[in-house]
């Protein structure tokens, strides 16, 4: 998100959703988000709860496509799938 980029904020958001029997995503909800002014690979990084990445992550999740789960030869939905979206600023 632009606001995070302008502030030099990095972090992540964890999104939960359902993969439908056609492989699309629905019901995407961000369940937690954390921010830091340091890179996630920095040993001194300290994350704090924040919502800066929540809406962008939920919108991105809806665009994901998966190969449907097959049970007994039939595609079935999968609920409670978790995906972590990580946001790291480019150092260039």
Give residue spans per PLM region.
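Charge-biased low-complexity segments
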Residues: 1-92
């Amino acid at each position: 998100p632009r606001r995070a980029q302008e502030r030099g904020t990095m972090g992540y958001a964890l999104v939960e959703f359902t993969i439908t029997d056609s492989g699309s995503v629905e019901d995407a909800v961000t369940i937690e988000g954390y921010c830091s002014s340091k890179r996630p690979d920095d040993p001194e990084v300290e994350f704090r709860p924040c919502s800066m990445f929540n809406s962008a992550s939920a919108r991105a999740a809806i665009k994901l496509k998966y190969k449907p789960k097959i049970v007994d030869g039939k595609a079935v939905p999968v609920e409670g799938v978790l995906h972590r979206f990580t946001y790291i600023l480019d150092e260039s």
